[in-house]
Structures are given as C-alpha cells and as structure tokens.
Amino acid sequence: KYKEYVIEDLKIRQILLEKLKNAGVSDIQIERSSNKLKVFIYVARPGILIGRGGTGLDELKKFLILKLNIKDKNVLEIVPRDIKSTDLSAYLVAQSVVEQLVKRMSAQRVMNQVIDRVMRAGAKGVRIVLSGRIGGADIARRERKAAGVMPLHTLRQDIDFVSIPAMTKRGYVGVKVWINKGEVEI
C-alpha cells in the first residue's frame, strides 16, 4: 500500500502545482488517516485558490477526485493555508529568480536584489547558487552569493532549501536557494 500512496502523493503534488501556478504555492503537505486524505496547500495568494464563494476549491476537489479515481467524495479534504511572508519561502524566492533569469536580467543583479529582499523580511541568512550557462556564456560556471549565517550542519536551525531549473534561451541554469529562518524550538 505504501508504494501506491507515494505515487498518489506525487500525482497530487504535480496536479496542484500545475493547476495553481499563479497562486504562488510554496508547500503541499499531505496527511492520511484510515479513511481521510487531507491536503494542506500553503499559498501566497489564497484568493486565486479559493475563488469566488469557494467555487475554485470545489472545482479543484472535483478535478483531483476525477484524476485520482476516488470513489467517495468525502475522503478528500483540501485545506488552504496563507503564507505570512513570501520572501521567507525558498520555493517562491527561487521561482522569482527563475522568472527574472528567463527574462534575461543580469544574474548578479537578480541575486543581490533577492538577498536584500530576503534579509529585510527577517531571515537569519540566505544563500543562492546559480550554475550553468549564466547569461548565455559559452562556458558553464557557478555563481554563489550569501548573506548572514547558514549553518548547514546544525539540526537546530530551520533551513528551507529548494533547487529549481531555469530554462533560458541558451540552456538550463540551475537555481538553488537556502533560507535560514532561525532556531527551532525542540
């Protein structure tokens, strides 16, 4: 059963990320109990997900039930959650870097602006790595920028990490973002 659940979870994530591109999805958490499937969607713009009078949520639920072949409609529950700060979500920050690189903006400038924005939002540290044919160069290279502290060997720190490829006109550029949100209460 575990194998089927993992495949189903991947399908759910894929469908939701595809459907909610403009809503700014930063994280999708899936909880399963014996007869319930709860999907928590962390969104920057919940209005796009919910729609007028909750119609968007109902449509999304019907679409997921159809795609996943769920027989009982009460099994699936979608719970939208609002993100306090979009600049503290590594996925949304990386997505903004990707969009700017695709628009052919200078990689150095993009990294500097993003680092300033994230640090102003209240992060303890941030690190961005771009690798590939940056700026359409013939020889691939790796660019790194960091600010604040980024202790990657410490389990007490809440570090958000994501890696996303950016398809530019001259090829792929890998974008990696680490954001240190501070210490976690254990």
Model regions and ranges:
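RNA-contacting regions in translation and RNA-metabolism proteins
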Residues: 1-186
